[in-house]
Design a protein with these regions (language model features):
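Cofactor-cradling patches in redox/metallo enzymes
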Residues: 157-248, 282-299, 303-395
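Residues immediately within or flanking Cys/His clusters that coordinate Zn2+
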Residues: 19-29, 63-73, 186, 278, ...
Length: 395
C-alpha cells in the first residue's frame, strides 16, 4: 500500500480531494456504461484509491475504458468529479512511462499533422468535392474575412462516413446566405491529447493556433458540429488566454434554432415520420444543451419525437467518447449496441444525434446488429426534410 497515493491524487486537480468523501454508494457503477469492461468496477476502483492500493488501481487500467461521459459525476451524491479523476489516473500512468497502442499512434499523428489521422491538411476538405460547387463558390468558403467561422473538427472532416454532416451544414448556411468561412489551417481542438493522459496544459498550442486562425478572419461567431470541440473551446481554451474569447462559440443546433421555424415546411406534403434523439454527452450533460435540437425537430412538419428511456441530461453514452474507440473498440461497439437497443424500443424510423462521433459509433453498431433504424445527424435529417419540400430555409 502507498498511503500517499490518495493525498497526491487529491492535490492534482481542484475537486479531486472530494474522492476522500466517497461513501461507496455504488451510484457510479450503476451509472457506468463501460463498467463491464473494467476489471475493477468504478466503486471498487475508488475504494482502492481511498485505501492507498496504488498497484491495484494503476495495474487495472480500467481508467482507459472510461468514456468520460460524466453520468457518474451527475449522479454522485457527494459531487465528486469522477471522470476528471479518471483523467488524472491516465496522466499518472503517462508520467510513469506507460503507453497504450491506440493512444500512442493518435498522439503521433497529432504531433505530425495537427489531426488525429495524420492526414495532410488539404485532406480535411475532401468532402467539399461532393457539394457540386464551382471554383468560385469553393473559393468563397475560404475567404479572408467573415462574420462566422465553421470549425469542422477532425471526425467530420476526415471520416467519409460522416462527411454528410459538414456538407449539410455548408448547404444550409449557404441557403441562409450566412457570411461564413472555413479555416484553411484548422487543427484538432486537442481533446485526444488531454484524454490521452497529457493533461489540459498540453492543449495550449492547439488553443493558441486555433484562436489565432479564427481571429485572423475577424469572426464574431464560431459554429461547431462537434460537441467535444465546443466543450474544449468554452471550458479549456479560456485557461490559456488572459482575456475572454473575442468570438462566441455555438453548436449548430443553437445557431439554427432561431432560424429554422415552422415556416420552413408549412403546408408541406412530406411523409410523416417518427424520430428519436440521442443526446451527446458533452452537449447535453456537460453543456446542458438539450432543448435546441428538440426545438428544431418541433419546427419540422410531420416529425414526431419519441424519447428514449434515458434522454436529456440523463442520456446514456454512445460509447464513442473518452478515446475509448482507440483503446477498446470492442467495448465501444458493445456500448453503442445497447444504445441502439434503447432507440429500437421507441419504434422510431430514425435515430438522430448532433455529434459526429455519436453518428459514427451508433451507425457502426446499427449495421453490425442489422438494426432496422436509420442513423443520421440532425443536420442531415434537417436538410433531407428541407429538400423534400423544395422550399428555402426561413430566416
Amino acid at each position: 500500500m502507498n498511503f500517499d497515493f490518495l493525498d497526491i491524487l487529491s492535490r492534482e486537480k481542484e475537486g479531486n480531494e472530494k474522492i476522500k468523501t466517497c461513501i461507496q454508494c455504488g451510484s457510479c457503477t450503476g451509472s457506468c456504461v463501460a463498467s463491464d469492461g473494467m476489471s475493477l468496477s468504478p466503486r471498487k476502483l475508488w475504494r482502492n484509491v481511498q485505501m492507498g492500493m496504488e498497484a491495484d488501481v494503476m495495474g487495472s487500467l480500467g481508467f482507459w475504458n472510461c468514456t468520460t461521459c460524466g453520468l457518474c459525476d451527475k449522479r454522485c451524491p457527494r459531487g465528486i468529479p469522477l471522470s476528471q479523476i479518471m483523467l488524472s489516473l491516465r496522466e499518472k500512468f503517462d508520467r510513469a512511462g506507460g503507453s497504450v497502442a491506440g493512444i500512442t499512434q493518435t498522439l503521433d499523428n497529432l504531433r505530425k499533422s495537427g489531426n488525429i489521422m495524420g492526414e495532410d491538411a488539404a485532406n480535411r476538405f475532401l468532402w467539399i468535392d461532393n457539394l457540386g460547387l464551382t471554383e468560385k463558390e469553393r473559393g468563397e468558403l475560404f475567404k479572408g474575412k467573415s462574420e462566422v467561422v465553421y470549425f469542422i473538427g477532425c471526425v467530420g472532416a476526415l471520416f467519409p462516413q460522416v462527411g454528410g454532416i459538414p456538407q449539410s451544414l455548408v448547404k444550409i448556411l449557404r441557403k441562409l446566405k450566412t457570411d461564413f468561412s472555413l479555416l484553411e489551417n484548422e487543427w484538432c481542438c486537442g481533446y485526444p491529447v488531454m484524454g490521452g493522459g497529457k493533461g489540459a496544459d498540453s492543449l495550449r498550442e492547439y488553443a493558441e493556433h486555433n484562436i489565432a486562425a479564427i481571429e485572423s478572419k475577424g469572426a464574431k461567431t464560431v459554429i461547431v458540429s462537434c460537441p467535444t470541440c465546443y466543450y474544449i473551446f468554452n471550458k479549456v481554451y479560456p485557461k490559456f488566454i488572459d482575456k475572454p474569447l473575442s468570438f462566441n462559440v455555438m453548436h449548430y443546433a443553437e445557431y439554427l434554432e432561431g432560424l429554422i421555424t415552422d415556416k420552413c415546411l408549412a403546408g408541406s406534403e412530406t411523409k410523416s415520420v417518427t424520430v428519436t434523439y440521442h443526446d451527446p454527452c458533452d452537449l447535453g450533460r456537460k453543456l446542458h444543451i438539450t432543448d435546441a435540437p428538440r426545438n428544431i425537430l418541433k419546427g419540422l412538419s410531420g416529425v414526431t419525437l419519441a424519447e428514449m428511456r434515458f434522454s436529456g441530461e440523463e442520456g446514456k453514452c454512445c460509447g464513442g467518447g473518452g478515446n475509448l474507440e482507440m483503446t477498446n473498440s470492442e467495448l465501444s461497439l458493445n456500448i453503442a449496441s445497447k444504445r441502439i437497443g434503447d432507440a429500437l424500443e421507441t419504434g422510431a424510423e430514425y435515430l438522430l444525434s448532433s455529434c459526429q462521433q455519436c453518428r459514427r459509433t451508433l451507425q457502426n453498431a446499427a449495421r453490425k446488429g442489422r438494426a432496422r433504424i436509420k442513423v443520421m445527424d440532425l443536420l442531415e435529417f434537417l436538410l433531407l426534410r428541407l429538400e423534400e419540400t423544395g422550399k428555402e430555409v426561413a430566416k
